[in-house]
Swiss-Prot record:
Basic residues bias spans: 1-17
Encoding gene, per UniProt annotation: rplT
Described function: Binds directly to 23S ribosomal RNA and is necessary for the in vitro assembly process of the 50S ribosomal subunit. It is not involved in the protein synthesizing functions of that subunit.
Domain of life: Bacteria
Sample GO molecular function, one term: rRNA binding
Gene Ontology cellular component annotations, sorted alphabetically: ribonucleoprotein complex; ribosome
Family named by the database record: Belongs to the bacterial ribosomal protein bL20 family.
GO biological-process terms attached to the record: ribosomal large subunit assembly; translation
Cited NCBIfam families: rplT_bact
Keywords annotated in UniProt: Ribonucleoprotein, Ribosomal protein, RNA-binding, rRNA-binding
Protein name: Large ribosomal subunit protein bL20
InterPro entries membership: Ribosomal_bL20, RIBOSOMAL_L20_CS, Ribosomal_protein_bL20_C
Alphabetical list of Pfam families matching this protein: Ribosomal_L20
Region of interest: Disordered: 1-29
Organism: Mycobacterium ulcerans (strain Agy99)
Amino acid sequence: MARVKRSVNAHKKRRSVLKASKGYRGQRSRLYRKAKEQQLHSLNYAYRDRRARKGEFRKLWISRINAAARANDITYNRLIQGLKAAGVEVDRKNLADIAITDPAAFTALVDVARAALPEDVSAPSGEAA
């Protein structure tokens, strides 16, 4: 069996790992073993956080909608309940965008939601329309 010398492949592999680890702090950008370990962690963090980003954006949209809804004397919960009852199908991303860019349209949506809400005794006193 022929002897396999791996110097070219090994150098190529190490060079690619060190190139990918540019910008890391300290030894993690200079030493191959540390750089390889950090790169594995970095790729895991990237994979995990790409999924976590979706939930973070949803939280951001909900807090923006809630702030705009409370400015219109209704809670987020009652607003969403009213929009569902009225058959208004607008997702949270677009609703948050409307709340920021077009407050008049958001107020109109709040009025639609209020009209569709049932009058019940469990609603807070300031929200009964």
